[in-house]
C-alpha cells in the first residue's frame, strides 16, 4: 500500500514538474519573442535614424557643394570682369608720350600696347573651397583675348592717324563769371544765352536784384552776343591776308611746344599763333573743345562749315572727335579754296602724321577736304 502511494506521488510530482517545465518554456519563449521584437524595433529605429542622418549629411554635402561651386563661379566671373576692366586702355596724361618709336603715316591704323593684368586676386570662404588653377588660367587667357579684341576694334574705328586717347573727358558746360560794376543778372543772362532764373537756380540766388561786385557766378560756356567784325575794304583785306601769311611762314618748318608737354602737338602751333594775336593761348581738354571752352566774344567769330563756306588765311580749323582718337585736330588755314571748287583747303599743321609727340614732325603744309562737321574760327585781328 505504501509503495503504491509513493508511486502515485512520484507520478503526480512528475506531471507537476512537466507542467512547470512547460510553463517555464512558454515564459522563456514569450520573453525571447519580446526581446527579439524589442531588438528588431530598436534596430529598425536606428536604421531609420541612420537613414535620416545620412539624408541630412547628403543634403548638407549637396548644399556645401553647390555653395562651393557658386563661390567658385562668382570668383571666376569677378576675376574675369576685373581682368576686363584692368585690360582697358589706361588713359593718363603721360600716355601721350608712350615709347612708340615708329611714325605712322596718314590713314594707317594706330598701334598701341595694351596692358592686361593677369594676376587676379581670388578670395575663398573657409578651407573647403578649392580653385582649379588650370581653369582659372584658362579664364584669364580668354579675358585677355576679349580685352585685346575689344581694344583692337576701337583702334580700327580711328579714321585719322593723329595720336590720342580712346576715351576722353567732355568739355565743361559752365564757366565762372566774376560780377563787375554795373552788371545785372538780366544782362549776364543775355550775354551768355541763358535766363535769369537759370542763373538764380544754378548759383542759389534768392533775390535776382541783389548781386555783388566780385561775386563768382556759374554761367554757360558759349555767350550769346558776338560783336560784329569790322568791315574792311578789299585792299585792306588783301594786305591783312598777306601780313598773316607772312607771319605764318615764320612758323613753318619748325617745331612748337607752347605748354612744354607732349612734344609738338597741333594745339601748340595754334596756341603760338593765338598768343601772337591776343597775348594768351586757348583752353580745351582736346582740340575739338576749342570752340566751346573759350570766350571768343571780342576776339573771333565762329563759323560752321557749309557747302558755300570759304575759309580765309589765318582762320583756325577745328576737326571733330572723329579725328585724333577722339580729341580732334586743329590747324591754321593758308588757302581756303585750294582746288578752286571749295572742296579742299590748305593749312599749316603740326602732328598731323603723329610725329609731333616725339618731336619728329615740324609744322608743315597739308591739304584737307572740307568736312561737314568742321568748325572755323576767324580772328578779328590779323597777324
Swiss-Prot record:
Show the Pfam families listed in the entry.
CHAP, LysM
Localization (cell): Secreted
Q: Name one GO cellular component term.
A: extracellular region
Record domain LysM: where: 175-219
Predominant place of localization: secreted
Tree of life domain: Bacteria
Q: Which GO terms describe its molecular function?
A: hydrolase activity; lytic endotransglycosylase activity
Domain Peptidase C51, chain residue ranges per copy: 241-378
- Coiled coil segments of this chain: none
BP term (GO), one: cell wall organization
Q: What EC number(s) does its UniProt record assign?
A: 3.-.-.-
Instruction: Could you list this entry's UniProt keywords, alphabetically sorted.
Output: Cell wall biogenesis/degradation, Hydrolase, Secreted, Signal
Q: Where is the signal peptide?
A: 1-49
PANTHER family attached to this UniProt entry: LYSM DOMAIN-CONTAINING GPI-ANCHORED PROTEIN 2, MEMBRANE-BOUND LYTIC MUREIN TRANSGLYCOSYLASE D
Instruction: Give a short account of what the protein does.
Output: Probably involved in peptidoglycan hydrolysis.
NCBIfam families, per database record = YSIRK_signal
Name this polypeptide is given: Probable cell wall hydrolase LytN
According to its UniProt entry, this protein's organism is Staphylococcus aureus (strain COL)
Gene for this chain: lytN
Amino acid at each position: 500500500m505504501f509503495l503504491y502511494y509513493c508511486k502515485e506521488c512520484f507520478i503526480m510530482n512528475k506531471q507537476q514538474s512537466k507542467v512547470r517545465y512547460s510553463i517555464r518554456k512558454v515564459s522563456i519563449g514569450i520573453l525571447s519573442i519580446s526581446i527579439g521584437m524589442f531588438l528588431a524595433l530598436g534596430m529598425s529605429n536606428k536604421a531609420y535614424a541612420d537613414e535620416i542622418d545620412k539624408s541630412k549629411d547628403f543634403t548638407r554635402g549637396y548644399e556645401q557643394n553647390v555653395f562651393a561651386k557658386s563661390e567658385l563661379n562668382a570668383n571666376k566671373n569677378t576675376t574675369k570682369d576685373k581682368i576686363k576692366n584692368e585690360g582697358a586702355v589706361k588713359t593718363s596724361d603721360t600716355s601721350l608720350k608712350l615709347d612708340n618709336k615708329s611714325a605712322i603715316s596718314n590713314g594707317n591704323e594706330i598701334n598701341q600696347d595694351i596692358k592686361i593684368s593677369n594676376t587676379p586676386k581670388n578670395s575663398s570662404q573657409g578651407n573647403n573651397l578649392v580653385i582649379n588653377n588650370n581653369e582659372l588660367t584658362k579664364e584669364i587667357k580668354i579675358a585677355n583675348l576679349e580685352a585685346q579684341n575689344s581694344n583692337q576694334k576701337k583702334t580700327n574705328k580711328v579714321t585719322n592717324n593723329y595720336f590720342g586717347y580712346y576715351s576722353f573727358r567732355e568739355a565743361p558746360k559752365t564757366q565762372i563769371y566774376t560780377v563787375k560794376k554795373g552788371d545785372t543778372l538780366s544782362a549776364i543772362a543775355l550775354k551768355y544765352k541763358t535766363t535769369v532764373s537759370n542763373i538764380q537756380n544754378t548759383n542759389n540766388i534768392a533775390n535776382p536784384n541783389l548781386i555783388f561786385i566780385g561775386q563768382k557766378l556759374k554761367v554757360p560756356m558759349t555767350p550769346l552776343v558776338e560783336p560784329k567784325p569790322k568791315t574792311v575794304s578789299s585792299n585792306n583785306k588783301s594786305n591783312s591776308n598777306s601780313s598773316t601769311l607772312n607771319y605764318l611762314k615764320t612758323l613753318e618748318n619748325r617745331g612748337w611746344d607752347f605748354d612744354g608737354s607732349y612734344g609738338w602737338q597741333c594745339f601748340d602751333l595754334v596756341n603760338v599763333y593765338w598768343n601772337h594775336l591776343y597775348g594768351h593761348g586757348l583752353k580745351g581738354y582736346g582740340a575739338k573743345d576749342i570752340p566751346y571752352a573759350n570766350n571768343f566774344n571780342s576776339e573771333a567769330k565762329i563759323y560752321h562749315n557749309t557747302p558755300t563756306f570759304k575759309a580765309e588765311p589765318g582762320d583756325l580749323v577745328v576737326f571733330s572727335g572723329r579725328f585724333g582718337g577722339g580729341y580732334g585736330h586743329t590747324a591754321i588755314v593758308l588757302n581756303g579754296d585750294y582746288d578752286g571748287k571749295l572742296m579742299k583747303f590748305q593749312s599749316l599743321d603740326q602732328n598731323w602724321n603723329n610725329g609731333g609727340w616725339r618731336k619728329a614732325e615740324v609744322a608743315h603744309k597739308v591739304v584737307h577736304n572740307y568736312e561737314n562737321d568742321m568748325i572755323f574760327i576767324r580772328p578779328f585781328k590779323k597777324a
